[in-house]
Amino acid sequence: QGFCGLTEVIGDLCHWHRKVDFQPPSGFNDVGRVVFETSERVLEYGVEQDYLEIWQRLPDSVEDPWVNVSAGTDTAARMMQIGVGKYFMHVRPRAPSLPVADLEHDLDALRAWVDFEISFGEQTADGTRRILRSTLPWQESLILA
């Protein structure tokens, strides 16, 4: 799973408003009840679905937050990078929207549907960014300018 969007916090409930999503719509709102177990660990309990997620803060991930957004009318040109400390995420949505129903299996269409990037990486002291994990495996170990 992976998405990029906005988080709305009301009391102990978090509502995630997905602007771009790696998966097709599920029919459920993304709402979780959060419990701060420690200053380094958050437990998230599903409200509309039954799940538990455990979020653990990574070392070196508390300073120097930044955001870089490239917006445009062409979906393929949209991109977002966010970072904090020595870590960053890079998100680029697929150009076509995922269909609600199965369509004929056209190879080019299938390739376009999976062309959605969410990459997680690490930034070194000199500013070099290297992708560690990605929805596009060939991006892993790539150095970003």
Where are these regions (language model features)?
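Lipid interaction determinants
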Residues: Q1-G2, L13-A145
